[in-house]
């Protein structure tokens, strides 16, 4: 299943620096396939796309980043966009 996670964080300089440094070194859980992330410093959010069938991997990923607040959405790829998938 594909997921889009929107992570929000405080926009203070210390938090942003820490997140950027950790992000460069971070290894996604091995159960994540095709993980991609986009970081918006000014907006205080990151968008992460990944594929996994393992709920524990999602939990492990979110606990690795306690300073972030996650909204995670299951999505289905279509020809023109990603569509929200109702569970």
Predicted regions and their residues:
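Alpha-helix C-cap/termination motif
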Residues: 41, 64-65
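Short, electropositive alpha-helical surface patch
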Residues: 58-64
């Amino acid at each position: 299943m594909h997921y889009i996670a929107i992570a929000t964080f405080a926009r203070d300089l210390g938090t942003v620096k820490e997140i950027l440094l950790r992000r460069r070194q971070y290894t996604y859980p091995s159960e994540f396939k095709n993980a991609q992330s986009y970081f918006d410093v000014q907006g205080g959010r990151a968008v992460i796309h990944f594929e996994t069938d393992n709920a524990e991997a999602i939990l492990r990923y979110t606990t690795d980043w306690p300073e972030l607040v996650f909204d995670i959405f299951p999505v289905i790829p279509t020809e023109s966009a990603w569509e929200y998938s109702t569970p």
